[in-house]
A protein has these predicted regions:
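Hydrolase active-site cap/lid region
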Residues: 230-299, 351-355
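Short beta-strand/loop motif that positions the catalytic acidic residue
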Residues: 296-297, 303-305, 309
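Gly/Ala-rich beta-loop-alpha elbow adjacent to hydrolase catalytic centers
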Residues: 220-224, 228
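An N-terminal hydrophobic leader/cap segment in hydrolases
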Residues: 2, 54-108, 113-134
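C-terminal catalytic histidine-bearing segment of alpha/beta-hydrolase fold enzymes
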Residues: 2, 10-29, 314, 318-319, ...
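Alpha/beta-hydrolase
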Residues: 151, 182, 247-248, 342
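Membrane-embedded segments
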Residues: 42, 110-207
């Protein structure tokens, strides 16, 4: 037993002596040096990449205002977002994929422009609509039921889910609903502009008025609220008056709305950026002055706005309500301006006011008061 221990001791001593040879020491030092160099190299590479990314981000940040100024049409595309044709691959010529008892047709508001429209029947007409053609559907606009012309916001088409869901609710409540894709949107030809969108909606409104024997009112959402008040004011200037106007998530004017955009807010601290933004909008002839329009608009107005709207702040809807109310009082009129605020706790945000269970009651009550005037 002791002999084994002695032999193990001699082996350990030999190993220890071997470990301490100059060649092995040099090898270990070389390995440690290589590891440190590798670690230092990794740190240097990480710092270099971080600097490059930071430089790229700074370049992009600085170049955005310059590029938009040099190419002002870019801002127009950002505002209209008409090239984002959600839902992709939707066949707008077959509305039955999205809505029951809905016909698709096109109108030509001016030469070279064709706009797509869906006409959704009130639920009460569905049974009679079985097997009927487009002419019969058009004739139903004269059945005495109210007609809503829905003017949607930017991006997407009339087939976008929150738009379709609103149409379903309004149809169930007994309204004819006509959903328009402005020029450049969906299956409509042409390029969007404020003047063009207004022309398209005005043409549809006048076309419907020729068919209908009941109230015809405009329902604008987001970008569409500017189109709505433009149309209503244009009609008023021609000696007529839109029966009623519903503004869902409206903005005061496009300049103010653009200032509130998250991208714009990143630049607001830069001197001169705000005036540059307004100048570019002016170059694009994009104003959509809801505030100015409501100062003179005589049509009844209902404003719907959610407190938690993360696109257009609720205070803009409140400001428009105050403007319209003051204008109404100046005309010694009553009952023509109403506003409904949806609490933030409901979570409707910008696109989901249609989910409110009292929506049709609110709209129906408003229209009933309009009829009594």
């Amino acid at each position: 037993m002791s002999a084994v221990k002695m032999r193990n001791r001699r082996l350990n001593t030999a190993d220890s002596n071997a470990d301490s040879t100059p060649e092995l020491k040099e090898s270990k030092q070389s390995q440690r040096k290589t590891a440190k160099e590798r670690q230092t190299g990794c740190r240097s590479l990480l710092v270099l990449r971080t600097r490059r990314i930071a430089l790229l981000l700074c370049t992009v940040y600085i170049s955005v205002p310059v590029v938009v100024y040099l190419f002002p049409w870019i801002l127009g595309h950002v505002i209209f977002l008409h090239l984002l044709r959600f839902p992709f691959f939707a066949d707008l010529a077959i509305p039955s994929e999205f809505l029951n008892y809905t016909t698709n047709f096109h109108l030509s508001p001016e030469e070279g422009v064709s706009v797509g429209v869906w006409h959704t029947l009130p639920v009460s007409q569905w049974e009679q609509a079985e097997g009927r053609g487009p002419e019969w559907h058009r004739g139903t606009l004269g059945d005495g039921r109210p007609v809503i012309i829905y003017l949607h916001g930017n991006a997407g088409t009339r087939a976008l889910s929150h738009r379709v869901n609103l149409v379903k609710i309004l149809s169930a409540a007994g309204y004819h609903v006509l959903s328009l894709d402005y020029r450049g949107y969906g299956d409509s030809s042409g390029e969007p502009s404020e003047a063009g969108l207004t022309t398209d909606a005005l043409y549809l409104y006048r076309w419907v008025k020729q068919q209908s024997r009941s109230l015809v009112f405009l329902w604008g959402h987001s970008l569409g609220t500017g189109v709505t008040t433009n149309v209503a004011l244009r009609e008023q200037q021609q000696g007529s008056r839109v029966d009623a106007v519903v503004l869902e998530a409206p903005y005061t004017n496009m300049g103010k709305a653009a200032e509130c955009h998250p991208i714009s807010m990143m630049y607001m601290f830069i001197p001169g950026f705000k005036s540059l933004l307004w100048k570019i909008l002016e170059m694009n002839n994009i104003v959509f002055p809801n505030d100015k329009n409501l100062e003179t608009l005589a049509s009844p107005v209902l404003i719907l706005h959610s407190e938690d709207d993360n696109v257009i702040p609720h205070h803009m809807g409140q400001e428009l309500y105050n403007i319209a109310l003051q204008a109404e009082r100046a005309r010694n009129a009553g009952g023509h301006v109403e506003m409904v605020t949806l609490p933030a706790s409901l979570g409707y945000s910008h696109n989901h006011i249609y989910m409110d269970p009292s929506l049709t009651t609110v709209v129906g009550g408003f229209l009933q008061r309009v009829k009594q005037k």
